[in-house]
């Protein structure tokens, strides 16, 4: 081959075209032969896996020599073509194109050579645990393979074998790197599956090895740096750090942020640093932000020193790796979750519950700033302000939100508590809240000055007849203890609003309004069944609603001049809620009254219309019905005793007794025939009602004070006097009936109509001339 090239180069003058074509053909055949041998060798090595190292080296030498010959011949041809272009341009061009095709084939063979060399060097580096060098050789082989794939004329079967070989070797080095990583970063967990208990935290450890156990003699950098840099070269560093970051967050950082008694302990030993936990007793229910920041800083500083502060920007054979610091990479991966954890488990619980403590929160804001600055110095964070600091600085909004949330939660708990636990309200009762702050001193002096002037100018403007001091007070009654606490909560919240910022004051004010809206919706629904079945609870609920409505009348006015200016233009009012609460209480009590009326009428329906009282069975049924009615009324009187205000109590009992009496009157006046015995027995039943009826009026627990209301029965029972007249008629003669009618002017005429009186006379007396005369007088 060398003599052939020498002969071509030594030839002087014009080359013979036939001779040149023959030589190029020979060269082409030789290229094809070498190509076949190389492909055969590659196929055997990467597809058939046969040892062929010596033949491969010989082929490499032949390829190099042949490449040099082609370059010399190509140069000579170009020279001859330029000299004799006008003679045989087309022929020389064809020869040149054929030669260029041969050059392409040779370049592909060179790429195969470089691929094979890179794989061989990779294997050597992997054997010597030079992971960075091995990773770089794999990347070189990857580039060679990519270039080969870009040539469509190459054998696809060989490319497939090479690609598979490259994949296998990459997974191989990643496996070895993973093993080295597990030796350098060792997690120790408790045997139990529960990893969220304090006991499991105390058994969790992280071991950071600064050197490998089998230290190599010639290592260009610390082993952990070598492993990380190799991961970086292979493009796997991000996923490896992300996995480490998630475990760090789950097993180290989150427990420190959520458990106040947990503290990190750093143990330094030869070639190893251990991060573990210890428990220190504390009375804190939630961790202090400043303490949590200190704990996390300690852990991150250790990681920064032992793991994250390693150079990844070294140029190795012109192969530049990532210049982003490891700390910043890890920070980007876990900071969002870490800051959310710090907010939910730490900062949220540090928000004050009282506006007077807001000033103390500046310390927490300052510690948050210091924490973030420390992380920025470690390059764990970038320069931008994070959500953590924004959350801490937005304390006014968070305080208002938390306060409002706490108020609503407390209010709802009170609304869903038992209604029957009551307290007595008297006209002098007051809400247990601190005194409201006085208005501005200047305004106070001005008011006093005007008042003194008017006092001296006008001697006495007080009217002769004054109202009672309790005219506008809520009457004595019993309300639920929970409702009293609910009103105290409303007053305390508004009092808090008077010393808060404008934004917070507005939120607190509307939270108080929301309390009453919530009461309107929750209580009737939550206690629906009891309010329907138990008359005492219905009465208490009625009082509760009236009590709230009573306070809502003046609640806004009391705080009007002390709230934020935006609320002082008339919006700070609760008067619009008053009708709704009055209606709520009234409807509930009226529904109970309707239920009681229904029971009374149902009992009286078993009296067999009070007819044929001479029949013992009928009389017994009527007597039983009357006694059941009286018993029901007495039981209601006891249930409502000392609960309802006296006037409401008397009206309610009077209405129910009036219903029963009206039914009795209606049944008796509807009878067509009443014998003497019937009349006597009906009179006896009516007398029972007349004697025991007033006893149901017992609004007060002291029996001596109830006599007044029992004597006023006719005031509350409209049918009481007609009932007495009915009793009189059952025992009276025709003459007595006529006298009480008194030409339509007597008490009987006031109680019954003429038709009703006539019907009773016809039922009571036989048809005689005297009866006819008596009927004639009834007009």
UniProtKB/Swiss-Prot annotation:
Expression tissues: Widely expressed.
InterPro entries attached to this UniProt entry: Zw10/DSL1_C_sf, ZW10_C, ZW10_C_2, Zw10_middle, Zw10_N
Keywords: Acetylation, Cell cycle, Cell division, Centromere, Chromosome, Coiled coil, Cytoplasm, Cytoskeleton, Endoplasmic reticulum, ER-Golgi transport, Kinetochore, Lipid droplet, Membrane, Mitosis, Phosphoprotein, Protein transport, Transport
Principal subcellular localization: cytoplasm
Cellular component aspect of the GO annotation: cytosol; Dsl1/NZR complex; endoplasmic reticulum; endoplasmic reticulum membrane; kinetochore; kinetochore microtubule; lipid droplet; membrane
Membrane topology: Peripheral membrane protein
Cellular location(s): Cytoplasm; Endoplasmic reticulum membrane; Chromosome, Centromere, Kinetochore; Cytoplasm, Cytoskeleton, Spindle
Domain of life: Eukaryota
Biological processes per GO annotation: cell division; endoplasmic reticulum to Golgi vesicle-mediated transport; establishment of mitotic spindle orientation; Golgi organization; meiotic cell cycle; mitotic metaphase chromosome alignment; mitotic sister chromatid segregation; mitotic spindle assembly checkpoint signaling
Interaction with RINT1 as annotated region, ranges: 2-317
Residues with PTM N-acetylalanine: 2
Pfam families: ZW10_C, ZW10_C2, Zw10_middle, Zw10_N
In-chain residues carrying the UniProt-annotated modification Phosphoserine: 3, 12
Cysteine disulfide links: none
Coiled-coil intervals, chain numbering: 14-130
GO molecular function: centromeric DNA binding
Annotated region (Interaction with ZWINT), positions in chain: 2-81
Miscellaneous comment text of the record: Overexpression as well as silencing of ZW10 disrupts the morphology of the ER-Golgi intermediate compartment as well as the Golgi apparatus and slows down ER-Golgi transport.
Family the UniProt entry places it in: Belongs to the ZW10 family.
Assembly with partners or alone: Interacts with NBAS and KNTC1/ROD; the interactions are mutually exclusive and indicative for its association in two different vesicle tethering complexes. Component of the RZZ complex composed of KNTC1/ROD, ZW10 and ZWILCH. Component of the NRZ complex composed of NBAS, ZW10 and RINT1/TIP20L; NRZ associates with SNAREs STX18, USE1L, BNIP1/SEC20L and SEC22B (the assembly has been described as syntaxin 18 complex). Interacts directly with RINT1/TIP20L bound to BNIP1/SEC20L. Interacts with C19orf25 and ZWINT. Interacts with ZFYVE1.
Function of the molecule: Essential component of the mitotic checkpoint, which prevents cells from prematurely exiting mitosis. Required for the assembly of the dynein-dynactin and MAD1-MAD2 complexes onto kinetochores. Its function related to the spindle assembly machinery is proposed to depend on its association in the mitotic RZZ complex. Involved in regulation of membrane traffic between the Golgi and the endoplasmic reticulum (ER); the function is proposed to depend on its association in the interphase NRZ complex which is believed to play a role in SNARE assembly at the ER.
Name of this protein: Centromere/kinetochore protein zw10 homolog
Naturally occurring in which organism (per UniProt): Homo sapiens (Human)
